[in-house]
């Protein structure tokens, strides 16, 4: 990355304005966010121990070792869901912490759900509970999404469990068959390729995967685009992200400008899809607001 680019990112145009942006976002999190996002904010921005994040996550872990209870808020189902395991792992990585017993139990659960390595995003158990329309009846096949994300995160956390190897083999088989053509599939693939131990194989697939992104479904290359999708900042949330090189400086700057503009009057950021309830919407807004703060701070737009 060019030094001039790094310098430019770390000189906010209006420090008073962006500091106010942060203060209003922090107020929104204090008023509206879940305990989990509040504890993660305290860890990332206030120097609090990551132990608080782990303790908040425990409330979502079930006796079977999986995570549920709407940890991913688009379904209000208490039963364990693979996608909720992914969110738990993402939270631990974000907090820079781990919990061996929690992770071993989660892997035991994943092995029971996907003994051949692959798991679906959600299970049919969600059908008995309120959920976003895109989850339908919860009948999904095992796939790269979310298996690749989960496997990559477990590698990032250094988890040693037989299922991690089984899931890794599943992901390689799927990627050898076909590289995803949608933004969600590419996002989880990138996460897997970033952390999987076989670096030679990962680097060989990085180029073909990256080549799919410009035309991928649900990818929003244009910072002025409206509606739901993943922007370049979803793939490169920090300047030193592995996939930052896929985007030019002007594109990143434009999306950072848009991210700043999208803050709402109440201090939070909006969601661009329809959650199953107002409670779910607020939970999601806490998640995306914290994500916006993390990205804007990483790129030098906030302090």
Predicted ranges, named:
Residues 2-303:
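Preference for long, amphipathic alpha-helical scaffolds in soluble/luminal domains
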């Amino acid at each position: 990355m060019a030094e001039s680019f790094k310098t430019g990112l770390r000189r906010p145009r209006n420090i008073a304005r962006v500091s106010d942006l942060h203060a209003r976002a922090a107020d929104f999190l204090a008023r509206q966010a879940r305990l989990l996002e509040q504890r993660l904010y305290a860890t990332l921005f206030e120097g609090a121990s990551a132990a608080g994040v782990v303790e908040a996550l425990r409330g979502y872990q079930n006796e079977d070792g999986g995570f549920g209870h709407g940890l991913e808020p688009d379904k209000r189902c208490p039963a364990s869901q693979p996608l909720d395991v992914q969110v738990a792992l993402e939270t631990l990585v974000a907090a820079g912490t781990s919990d061996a017993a929690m992770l071993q139990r989660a892997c035991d659960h994943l092995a029971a759900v996907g003994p051949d390595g692959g798991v679906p995003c959600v299970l049919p158990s969600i059908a008995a509970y309120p959920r976003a329309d895109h989850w339908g009846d919860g009948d999904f096949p095992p796939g790269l999404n979310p298996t690749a994300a989960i496997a990559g995160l477990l590698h990032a956390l250094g988890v040693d469990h037989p299922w991690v190897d089984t899931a890794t083999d599943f992901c390689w088989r799927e990627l050898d068959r076909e590289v995803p053509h949608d933004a969600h599939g590419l996002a989880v693939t990138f996460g897997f390729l970033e952390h999987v131990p076989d670096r030679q194989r990962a680097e060989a697939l990085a180029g073909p995967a990256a080549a799919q992104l410009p035309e991928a479904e649900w990818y929003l290359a244009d910072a002025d685009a409206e509606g739901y999708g993943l922007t370049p900042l979803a793939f490169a949330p920090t300047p030193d992200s592995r996939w930052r090189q896929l985007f030019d400086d002007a594109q990143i700057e434009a999306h950072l400008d848009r991210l700043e503009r999208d803050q709402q009057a109440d201090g939070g950021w909006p969601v661009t899809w329809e959650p199953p309830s107002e409670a779910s919407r607020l939970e999601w807004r806490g998640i995306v607001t914290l994500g916006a703060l993390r990205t804007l701070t990483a790129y030098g737009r906030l302090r």
